[in-house]
Amino acid sequence: MSSGTKRALADIIRRPLITEKGTRLLEENKYLFEVTPGANKIQIAQAIEELFSVKVTKVNTFNPPARQRRVGKYLGTRSSYKRAIVTLQEGDSITLFPEV
C-alpha cells in the first residue's frame, strides 16, 4: 500500500474516545473512535485494520446532533462529529495507551 493511501486512511480516524461507555465496551472487545463525518463503515474498517493490524468484524456509527451553546449574549453551535464503535475479531486487541 502506498504511503499516500495509508495517510488517507489515517486521516479517517481522528482519535480514540475514552468515556464511561467506551471503557465498558473494552470488556466486549469493542473500541470507540471519533471519525471524520464523511467516512463510511467500510472506510473505517479498512483504516482500523491497516493502522492497528487487527481484523474488524463489525462497525457501528453514530452521528450525534450539533448542540447549541451560548457564549455571553451570542448563540452558537458546537461542531458535529461522528463516532464509530469497532468490534474486533476474538483474540485481537488494540493498545490505546502504552503500559507505564
From Swiss-Prot:
It comes from the Bacteria. The keyword Lipid metabolism does not apply. Disulfide bonds: none annotated. Coiled coil: none annotated. One of the early assembly proteins it binds 23S rRNA. One of the proteins that surrounds the polypeptide exit tunnel on the outside of the ribosome. Forms the main docking site for trigger factor binding to the ribosome. Belongs to the universal ribosomal protein uL23 family. Part of the 50S ribosomal subunit. Contacts protein L29, and trigger factor when it is bound to the ribosome. This is Large ribosomal subunit protein uL23. It comes from Gloeobacter violaceus (strain ATCC 29082 / PCC 7421).
